[in-house]
Amino acid sequence: MKVAVAALAVLLCAMALCSQVFSAPFGADTPTACCFSYVARQLSRKIVADYFETSSQCSKPGVIFQTKKGRQVCANPTEDWVQEYITDLELNA
């Protein structure tokens, strides 16, 4: 009887571990930041410190600007001002 209870406990623990592994996201390419909406108006160039583009795995393309105060703001990559800021940041990097 003790053997059956011990075997059942081991089986339950193994099942719990397996379910956690399979429910976790696969791969290291899981996007960490995606844009679901964009800023409504142009940011002041003076407050923008850096940028990065969202992953291609995100549902919408986006550019995330990092402000000098550490805030992250999503912008539409097709807008002219966004492309100008990216060019300026690249040239001054």
Curated annotation (Swiss-Prot):
A Pfam family of this chain: IL8
Record PROSITE patterns: SMALL_CYTOKINES_CC
Gene Ontology CC terms, in alphabetical order: cytoplasm; cytosol; extracellular space
Protein origin, superkingdom: Eukaryota
GO biological process, one term: osteoblast differentiation
Subcellular location: Secreted
Cystines in this chain: C34-C58, C35-C74
Keyword Disulfide bond: yes
GO molecular function: CCR chemokine receptor binding; chemoattractant activity; chemokine activity; kinase activity; phospholipase activator activity; protein kinase activity
Key words of the record: Chemotaxis, Cytokine, Disulfide bond, Inflammatory response, Secreted, Signal
Xref: Gene3D superfamilies: 2.40.50.40
Signal peptide: 1-24
Main location: secreted
Family: Belongs to the intercrine beta (chemokine CC) family.
Free-text function comment from the UniProt entry: Monokine with inflammatory and chemokinetic properties. Binds to CCR1, CCR4 and CCR5. One of the major HIV-suppressive factors produced by CD8+ T-cells. Recombinant MIP-1-alpha induces a dose-dependent inhibition of different strains of HIV-1, HIV-2, and simian immunodeficiency virus (SIV).
Self-association and partners: Self-associates. Also heterodimer of MIP-1-alpha(4-69) and MIP-1-beta(3-69). Interacts with CCR1.
Protein name (record): C-C motif chemokine 3
Organism listed in the record: Bos taurus
Designated gene of the protein: CCL3
